[in-house]
Amino acid sequence: MSRRHSAEKREIIPDPKYGDVVLTKFMNSIMYEGKKSTAERIVYGAFDIVENRARANPIEVFRAALDNVAPMIEVRSRRVGGATYQVPVEVRTERRQALAIRWLIQAARSRNDRTMVERLSAELLDAANNRGNAVKKREDTHRMAEANRAFSHYRW
């Protein structure tokens, strides 16, 4: 265990429109160079498009997308006697959420639509329906863990 102090968890203020803490984390991850108002405009714009297309509550679509993208298990490298094994381990809740947010944003940024608002809304709808690059990333992670199940006894 480290002798240094671990970083204190900061309290995150819920977003003003929907009152959701996870949505604030999502906005903070989208934000570039401290431009929070731009990040808010992107997210709220995407939510408006989701509401029009899906005829559903955008927060519920967002939560469904996060649940469908969040990995249950991942592989971690572990050195044993000169060989490096990919050992499957369960993902902690906080890391699951962080990975889901990161993968959703990466997938949205890699899409070919015109604006980030359109890309994000399309990726959220795809992820909520178990499609899209973010869900594919989770499936790849699970596949890697399944392929390396033989090394699960090296878990720490």
Curated annotation (Swiss-Prot):
Name of the featured protein: Small ribosomal subunit protein uS7
Subunit structure: Part of the 30S ribosomal subunit. Contacts proteins S9 and S11.
Function summary: One of the primary rRNA binding proteins, it binds directly to 16S rRNA where it nucleates assembly of the head domain of the 30S subunit. Is located at the subunit interface close to the decoding center, probably blocks exit of the E-site tRNA.
Record's keyword terms, sorted: Ribonucleoprotein, Ribosomal protein, RNA-binding, rRNA-binding, tRNA-binding
Superkingdom classification of source: Bacteria
The encoding gene: rpsG
Biological process per Gene Ontology, one example term: translation
Family in the record: Belongs to the universal ribosomal protein uS7 family.
Entries under InterPro entries matching the protein: Ribosomal_uS7 (IPR000235), Ribosomal_uS7_bac/org-type (IPR005717), Ribosomal_uS7_CS (IPR020606), Ribosomal_uS7_dom (IPR023798), Ribosomal_uS7_dom_sf (IPR036823)
MF annotations from Gene Ontology: rRNA binding; structural constituent of ribosome; tRNA binding
NCBIfam families recorded: rpsG_bact
Native organism: Methylobacterium radiotolerans (strain ATCC 27329 / DSM 1819 / JCM 2831 / NBRC 15690 / NCIMB 10815 / 0-1)
Keyword tRNA-binding among record annotations: yes
GO cellular component, one term: small ribosomal subunit
One Pfam family named in its UniProt record: Ribosomal_S7
UniProt cross-references to CDD domains, sorted A to Z: uS7_Bacteria
Keyword flag Ribosomal protein: yes
